[in-house]
């Protein structure tokens, strides 16, 4: 029984470590999502709050149009990256939830096994105590008969 508990404890440590690793990965992924959101916001501000439209100069208008188009491509790319990062974060969240459940169920099994071991030990100790008490009682009975 003790070997089983030791094995369960080792498995519990592994599951606990897996939960911590997944928590760390999820936190990193959420930071990435936030960083991408800030990038998108900052790039959108560049497009929306750039210099006012220049009138008359075709080259300047062309440059400004090219600039806004490139910024918009970067925004679109960042949105795609954000969507992928969000999907990955959701996947990690699901994995973390599943791993947490496995870790918790193993913890409950381990607690039950420990309790069973304690109860078995207490029963053995009680049997020894009962045996010693019975011997004392028998000796007292024999001593009283001999008197």
PLM regions: where:
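Charge-rich amphipathic alpha-helical interaction elements
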Residues: 1-147
């Amino acid at each position: 029984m003790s070997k089983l508990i030791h094995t369960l404890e080792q498995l519990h440590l592994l599951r606990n470590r897996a939960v911590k690793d997944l928590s760390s990965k999820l936190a990193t992924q959420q930071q990435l999502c936030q960083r991408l959101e800030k990038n998108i916001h900052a790039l959108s501000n560049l497009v929306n709050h750039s210099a006012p439209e220049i009138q008359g100069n075709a080259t300047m208008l062309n440059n400004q149009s090219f600039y806004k188009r490139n910024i918009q491509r970067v925004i679109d790319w960042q949105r795609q990256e954000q969507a992928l990062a969000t999907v990955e974060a959701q996947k990690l969240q699901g994995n973390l939830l599943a791993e947490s459940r496995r870790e918790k169920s193993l913890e409950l099994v381990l607690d039950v096994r420990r309790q069973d071991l304690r109860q078995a030990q207490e029963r053995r100790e009680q049997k020894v105590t009962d045996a010693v008490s019975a011997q004392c009682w028998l000796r007292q009975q024999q001593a009283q008969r001999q008197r």
